[in-house]
Amino acid sequence: MDFHPLVVHFPIAFLTVYSLFELIRFQRVLEKPYWFFVKKVLIIVGWAGSLVAALTGFIASGWVIDGPRIFLMHRSFALLTIILSTVSAILYLKNKHNKVLIIFALLILISITITGGLGGAMVRGTTFDPLMAPIFKLLGVY
């Protein structure tokens, strides 16, 4: 059974919400005592879930090293998302006020969007989302 579709959406949700929370910089929100704990849970659970999602993806693909360009790009951006979330989690645990986390949050959102678009295109075809068309052309998956 292919568990990848069942597992993959949880880390996407956690990392997306973490990234959006990291980008919110309203003083009133930052003063909440639980704010940093919530973000810490989101980044750590999202990171751990992304590892499980990647593992189930590799299992579903039969541990294939090579394949169609869209598959290779999907895998590359998934690994980029894992790397970005790993660095973000480490930076966050060292200093939750690090301004570099804002840049990483934006990069995580971009990486998740591209990874998800490529994954959706593998299942639904490259014309399922017209907003992804410029990215698909840029990446050469058409």
Regions found by a protein language model. Give the residues of each.
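Polytopic transmembrane helical bundles with strong interfacial aromatic enrichment
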Residues: 1-142
